[in-house]
Every structure is written in structure tokens, then in C-alpha cells.
């Protein structure tokens, strides 16, 4: 039996002999179209583009309806980056032979390379019409159906490619990737996320049965298991990804998040830093690294990475929010306020940004602003216990007696065990200081109710010193 090397040598000799015989045939009959086409095809397969082009030009001159000749010339022009010429030649080929699946498919690939996606979709569809068992055409068509409104169509095309060819690794992988996010539009155009993670896991596991070195499938499984808090499985697949691709910034990023969840902060920091060495423009990596560095007592480096986060993504409200908190901790109140405001400008329903900005304004004794921001926090979340409680503290003035009383009571209604709300409500009721409608100060103590809330405070914490 011939070895692989011997087999290659034999093929080379056969091709060489074939070329000699074809050239001899053409010498005898220069108009021998089939000989020229076969010689051109042999030269093209060996990368001799100039010689191949010469033969195919002769072919289409001899027969101006020779679709395969125009097709091969189109492939050569595309290889030479003569895109306009290639396109014209593809058009001639598909006009003459519109039901040739291979020509339609390769024209689709050419258009995809030019980013003419709608036209590529048209030709992949025509390839499928010509050959309904053309798995690669279904796959390439699915790959271009990226709009959420085409979700079902993309899914069906991936599944058809796999039905035809069950060992189609890429089709299984990209089907898994599609259903993992489940981003689609319903009939009225509303954007939905309906992930099918079990289905995705099945797809990725099939990929790994076909090829256990398919690193991206390990990565996706690691991401899914991390979301499910199955940290051992997540860790296993993410480390396998890294073993197969040491430069995988995504694997390093997700390993960092898993390590953080497991309270292995130092390990998490190492993974995130390594991730940035391979891809420095990941705003999420900078964000999580910034938070971790702050937790590990390096607030300045934390700020550096959060600043990089907002440089890379100027609309990321959470980064502005945490920057504000870090600046507030450093007692840079002006920068803190500025960044809380930036968070709110990007997310008008950012409850915690309103809340902490309200607390900051209270600390700075800017009480009207403090009141406004705390009210905004409550507006975004009407069950926000701490919001009602702190608004009650802000309204600690005889002119706002009724409103403060209402805030404390609301906080207690939502969270009956909120000790400090009971305590400050009791203080307010026992003081009884309020204003009449005409602005005259008056004291009307509510001692019975005050006593009730003091007692409740003691029940919640018998050692609470302020009441004793």
C-alpha cells in the first residue's frame, strides 16, 4: 500500500501527465474547448492563476455561453482582488446557469466577503433552491440572518444544515450560540430575550463530541455553567478553553468573574489583568477589575480602570455610579456629584444613583437637593425602604412633620423589622414639633404611638443603647 507521501507524488505525476496530454491536444486542435477547460481547471487547482485565466478566456471566446468558464474566471478575478470584474463574471455565470448550486453558493461567498449581505442572502437562497441538500448553503445563509426578527429563520437553517450533516461542527456551534442568547423580535417588533440554555448546552456538547479541541464550545459552556452557579463545571470548561487558546481574553475574563464569585479576589485580579494583555479594549474587564482593586484597598487603581471603562463605553451608567462612590469615599464631593449625575443622565431610573446623590447632598447640607434626589429614588422603586427612611431624616423639620411621619410609617409598612425607622419615628412623635397652617410653631406630642415604636425598637434589639 502506498504511503501518504507516495500518494501525493503519484497524484502530482498524474496531473503533470494530464497537463502534457491536454497541451498536446490543444496544439493539435486550438479550438478544443473541453481540453482548454480541463487544463485551466488543473492549473487553477495548482494556483497557476495566470495560465488558468488564459485558458478560461479562450473557453468563453469559443463559447460565450459557457457558464463554468465565466465562473472560473470570476474565482480568479476574486483571488486577484479585481472585485468589479469578478462580480461581472459571476453575473454572467449565474445568468447562463441560474440553477447551478455551486456557482450560486460561491457567488454568495464572494458577496459576503464584500459585505453585500442582502445580495449574498439572495444567492445562498438560490443555491438551496438548486440543491436542497446543500448543508453549507443553509449554514452560510443562517450566519447572515443576524437581525433578531430573523431569529426563527436562522435557527431553522442551522438545524437543516445539521439534519443533512450531523457532524457539522460549526453549524452546531453557531446554533448553540444563537439559542444561548435567544435575542429575537415578536410579531409586533418588540425585542425579546428568550434563551434556550439547555438546547445550547446540547449543541456545544455535540460540537465537542465531533472535535474536543473546539475551544469556543468550551468557552460557551463555561459561560453557561457560570451563569447557573455551577462553578466547578464552569471552571473546567474555561480552563480547557485557555489550554487550547492561551490568548483567549474571554476565557480569562470569565475565569476572573468565577474566581470573584468564589471569593478568590487575588486570583480574579490576575485573570482580569491577563485578559487585558490580550484585549485591552474590553470595557467590562476594566469595570470588574476596577471594582476588585477597590475591594482590595487600591482605590486609585480602581478609579483608573473605571475611567478607562467610560472612555471605552461612554453610556455605561454603572461605571459612572461606582466612580461617584469611589470619589465620595475619597471626599472629592464635587467629582462624586458629577459622576452620580452622569449615571442618572444615562439611566433615568438608576435608583441607587439618586439615593446616594441624595445622601451626599444631605451630608453637604443641601437639603432641597437631597429631598429631590431621594424622592426620585422612591419614584423609581416605590418599595424602596431605605429611600423612605432617609427621606424621613431629610424632612426632619417642624414644617415637614406630616411628610416625615408618613415616610417612616411607609418604610415600616414595607419592612416591619426596620429598627432605625421605628426609632426615628418614635423620636419624631415624642417631640411633636410641627407648624400650624399659618406657620406658627406648635407642639402636639403623640406619646402613646411613640412608646409603641420605642418598644418595637427594643424588641428588635434589646441592647439598643439610645432608647435605654
Region locations from a protein language model:
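Eukaryotic tandem repeat interaction scaffolds
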Residues: 321, 352-362, 379, 384-397, ...
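A generic tandem-repeat structural signature
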Residues: 68-79, 88, 102, 106-113
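Helix-start (N-cap) detector for alpha-helical repeat units in TPR-like alpha-solenoids
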Residues: 33-34, 67-68, 101-102, 135-136, ...
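Short, intrinsically disordered, charge-balanced linker/junction segments flanking boundaries
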Residues: 204, 459-468
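Structural signature of tandem alpha-helical TPR/SEL1-like repeats
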Residues: 7-24, 45-58, 79-92, 112-126, ...
Amino acid at each position: 500500500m502506498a504511503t501518504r507521501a507516495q500518494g501525493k507524488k503519484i497524484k502530482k505525476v498524474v496531473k503533470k501527465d494530464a497537463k502534457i496530454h491536454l497541451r498536446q491536444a490543444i496544439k493539435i486542435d486550438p479550438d478544443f474547448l473541453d481540453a482548454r477547460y480541463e487544463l485551466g481547471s488543473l492549473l487553477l487547482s495548482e494556483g497557476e492563476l495566470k495560465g488558468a485565466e488564459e485558458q478560461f478566456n479562450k473557453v468563453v471566446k469559443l463559447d460565450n455561453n459557457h457558464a463554468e468558464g465565466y465562473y472560473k474566471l470570476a474565482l480568479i478575478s476574486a483571488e486577484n482582488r479585481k472585485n468589479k470584474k469578478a462580480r461581472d463574471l459571476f453575473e454572467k455565470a449565474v445568468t447562463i446557469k441560474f440553477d447551478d448550486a455551486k456557482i450560486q453558493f460561491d457567488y454568495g461567498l464572494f458577496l459576503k466577503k464584500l459585505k453585500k449581505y442582502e445580495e449574498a442572502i439572495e444567492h445562498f437562497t438560490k443555491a438551496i433552491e438548486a440543491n436542497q441538500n446543500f448543508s453549507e448553503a443553509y449554514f452560510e445563509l443562517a450566519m447572515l440572518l443576524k437581525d433578531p426578527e430573523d431569529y426563527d429563520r436562522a435557527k431553522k437553517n442551522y438545524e437543516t444544515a445539521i439534519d443533512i450533516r450531523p457532524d457539522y461542527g460549526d453549524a452546531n456551534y453557531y446554533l448553540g450560540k444563537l439559542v444561548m442568547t435567544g435575542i429575537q423580535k415578536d410579531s409586533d417588533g418588540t425585542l425579546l430575550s428568550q434563551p434556550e440554555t439547555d438546547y445550547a448546552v446540547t449543541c456545544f456538547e455535540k460540537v465537542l463530541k465531533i472535535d474536543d479541541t473546539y475551544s469556543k464550545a468550551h468557552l460557551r459552556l463555561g459561560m453557561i455553567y457560570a451563569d447557573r452557579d455551577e462553578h466547578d463545571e464552569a471552571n473546567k470548561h474555561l480552563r480547557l478553553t485557555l489550554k487550547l487558546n492561551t490568548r483567549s481574553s474571554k476565557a480569562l475574563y470569565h475565569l476572573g468573574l468565577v474566581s470573584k464569585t468564589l471569593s478568590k479576589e487575588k486570583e480574579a485580579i490576575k485573570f482580569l489583568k491577563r485578559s487585558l494583555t490580550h484585549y485591552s479594549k474590553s470595557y467590562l474587564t476594566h469595570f470588574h477589575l476596577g471594582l476588585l482593586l477597590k475591594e482590595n484597598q487600591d482605590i486609585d487603581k480602581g478609579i483608573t480602570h473605571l475611567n478607562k471603562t467610560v472612555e471605552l463605553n461612554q453610556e455605561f451608567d454603572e461605571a459612572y455610579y461606582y466612580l461617584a462612590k469611589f470619589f465620595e469615599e475619597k471626599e472629592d464631593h464635587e467629582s462624586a456629584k458629577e459622576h452620580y449625575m452622569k449615571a442618572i443622565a444615562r439611566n433615568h431610573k438608576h435608583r441607587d444613583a439618586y439615593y446616594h446623590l441624595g445622601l451626599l447632598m444631605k451630608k453637604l447640607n443641601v437639603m432641597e437637593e437631597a429631598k429631590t434626589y431621594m424622592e426620585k429614588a422612591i419614584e423609581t422603586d416605590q418599595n424602596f425602604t431605605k429611600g423612605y427612611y432617609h427621606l424621613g431624616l431629610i424632612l426632619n423639620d417642624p414644617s415637614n412633620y406630616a411628610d416625615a411621619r408618613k415616610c417612616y410609617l411607609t418604610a415600616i409598612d414595607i419592612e416591619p423589622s426596620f429598627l432605625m425607622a421605628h426609632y426615628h419615628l418614635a423620636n419624631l412623635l415624642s417631640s411633636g414639633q410641627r407648624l400650624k397652617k399659618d406657620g406658627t410653631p406648635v407642639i402636639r406630642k403623640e406619646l402613646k404611638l411613640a412608646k409603641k415604636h420605642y418598644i418595637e425598637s427594643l424588641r428588635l434589639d434589646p441592647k439598643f443603647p439610645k432608647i435605654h
